[in-house]
């Protein structure tokens, strides 16, 4: 299914359809303009996505195109090697993912890099995820990159820290800023080896 950028109008098999409310099966491709996709976490809405006033069902993937495209409506985002998955649909070339409320972002089994922006905001590759409260980084050698004045709060649990109101788990590295310990007993380790300046392990 090829979006047209006009409500209720799509193209498929070289046929232009107008006044369409529903389309079933397959994949969706966006326009060269700004496309807005909506999904839901409600039961029974898996593999459904809405765009241009059309409800697409049993969809496996959405390729948005080259613009500031958005997807909204979910609180569960799962990173892929490229793009991400939500509601059973793989999304590619999305610039912004807007959560409806406190959201969880899950990393891959490979090394992921998370760039902190504002509060509850994480950038992965070319996608900004908004209203995120939890990030489960995954099994790879994962890192979080903050601003020069980034504040990292230890949790007292291995590989788990808090930053920008986001609880990160399964994290191996954090870059930039300052570190604040817990109310418990914290152990910090440094090294005199060359190339380890400004590094600390906790």
Where are these regions (language model features)?
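Acidic, glycine-rich low-complexity segments
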Residues: 1-202
């Amino acid at each position: 299914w090829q979006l047209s950028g006009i409500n209720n109008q799509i193209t498929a098999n070289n046929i232009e359809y107008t006044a369409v409310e529903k389309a079933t099966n397959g994949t969706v491709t966006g326009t060269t303009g700004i496309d807005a996709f909506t999904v839901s976490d409600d039961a029974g809405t898996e593999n459904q996505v809405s765009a241009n006033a059309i409800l697409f069902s049993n969809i496996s993937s959405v390729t948005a195109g080259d613009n500031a495209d958005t997807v909204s409506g979910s609180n569960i985002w799962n990173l892929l090697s490229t793009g991400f998955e939500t509601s059973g649909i793989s999304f590619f070339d999305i610039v912004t993912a807007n959560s409806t409320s406190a959201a969880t972002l899950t990393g891959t089994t490979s090394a992921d890099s998370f760039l902190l922006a504002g509060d509850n905001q994480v950038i992965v590759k070319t996608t900004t995820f908004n209203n995120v409260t939890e990030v489960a980084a995954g099994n790879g050698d994962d890192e979080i990159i903050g601003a020069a004045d980034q504040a990292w709060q230890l949790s007292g649990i291995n590989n788990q820290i808090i930053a920008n109101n986001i609880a990160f788990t399964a994290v191996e590295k954090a870059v930039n800023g300052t570190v604040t310990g817990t109310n418990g007993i914290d152990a910090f380790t440094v090294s005199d080896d060359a190339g380890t300046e400004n590094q600390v392990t906790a």
